[in-house]
From Swiss-Prot:
<dbReference type="GO" id="GO:0007566">
    <property type="term" value="P:embryo implantation"/>
</dbReference>
<keyword id="KW-0963">Cytoplasm</keyword>
<dbReference type="GO" id="GO:0046785">
    <property type="term" value="P:microtubule polymerization"/>
</dbReference>
<keyword id="KW-0206">Cytoskeleton</keyword>
<feature type="modified residue" description="N-acetylalanine">
    <location>
        <position position="2"/>
    </location>
</feature>
<dbReference type="GO" id="GO:0001578">
    <property type="term" value="P:microtubule bundle formation"/>
</dbReference>
<keyword id="KW-0007">Acetylation</keyword>
<dbReference type="GO" id="GO:0005874">
    <property type="term" value="C:microtubule"/>
</dbReference>
<dbReference type="GO" id="GO:0046697">
    <property type="term" value="P:decidualization"/>
</dbReference>
<dbReference type="InterPro" id="IPR011992">
    <property type="entry name" value="EF-hand-dom_pair"/>
</dbReference>
<protein>
    <recommendedName>
        <fullName>Tubulin polymerization-promoting protein family member 3</fullName>
    </recommendedName>
</protein>
<dbReference type="GO" id="GO:0005737">
    <property type="term" value="C:cytoplasm"/>
</dbReference>
<dbReference type="GO" id="GO:0015631">
    <property type="term" value="F:tubulin binding"/>
</dbReference>
<dbReference type="Pfam" id="PF05517">
    <property type="entry name" value="p25-alpha"/>
</dbReference>
<comment type="similarity">
    <text>Belongs to the TPPP family.</text>
</comment>
<keyword id="KW-0493">Microtubule</keyword>
<feature type="compositionally biased region" description="Basic and acidic residues">
    <location>
        <begin position="134"/>
        <end position="144"/>
    </location>
</feature>
């Protein structure tokens, strides 16, 4: 069997992949998606001797009939099954040691994960300094919204009759 340091690294990798993508996961059980990711990221599934289909079949073999996840012991059994297929010329123990070294200490890779793109149209639509017309009046210079003051013209109807607006401005218009 593999050395105890390899087993510690193997268990650590199992836990990291088990919680990958699931904030509520405890790290005690791994689902099929994370098992496939582990095999792909750690180069266990090379596409020639071990394919993605093989990975899924082994997962189905080692998990319980109604279970959807595997624990650490089932994980080791699954690695043993894949080891003989991945390293054909070696004995079971040598193949398991080799596959443990592939997996031990690895973490889920986030390369190839798509990022939010900001293209020309997106920049133009979200940059408030480029707004024109009435939309321009809804934001101040810093780009912060003005609230209702930017959406409605607020009239000063402080006159004493409905037709008389802007009280106190008559004296400024009429010179004595």
């Amino acid at each position: 069997m593999a050395a105890s340091t390899d087993m510690a690294g193997l268990e650590e990798s199992f836990r990291k992949f088990a919680i990958h993508g699931d904030p509520k996961a405890s790290g005690q059980e791994m689902n099929g998606k994370n098992w496939a990711k582990l095999c792909k990221d750690c180069k266990v599934a090379d596409g020639k001797s071990v394919t993605g289909t093989d990975v899924d079949i082994v997962f189905s073999k080692v998990k319980g009939k109604s279970a959807r996840v595997i624990n650490y012991e089932e994980f080791k059994k699954a690695l043993e099954e894949l080891a003989t297929k991945r390293f054909k010329g070696k004995s079971k123990e040598e193949a398991f040691d080799a596959i443990c070294q592939l997996v031990a200490g690895k973490e889920p890779a986030n390369v190839g994960v798509t990022k939010a793109k900001t293209g020309g149209a997106v920049d133009r639509l979200t940059d408030t300094s480029r707004y024109t017309g009435s939309h321009k009046e809804r934001f101040d210079e810093s780009g912060k919204g003005k609230g209702i003051a930017g959406r409605q013209d607020i009239l000063d109807d402080s006159g004493y009759v409905s037709a008389y607006k802007n009280a106190g401005t008559y004296d400024a218009k009429v010179k004595k």
